[in-house]
UniProtKB/Swiss-Prot annotation:
Keywords: Antibiotic, Antimicrobial, Secreted. One of its GO terms (biological process) is defense response to bacterium. It is found in: Secreted. The lineage of its organism: Eukaryota, Metazoa, Chordata, Craniata, Vertebrata. This is Salmocidin-2B. Plasma serum. Antibacterial activity against Gram-negative bacteria.
């Protein structure tokens, strides 16, 4: 799953 937080993109699988 991918989400964007405060202009920071992180991908969690």
């Amino acid at each position: 799953a991918g989400f964007v937080l405060k202009g920071y993109t992180k991908t969690s699988q």
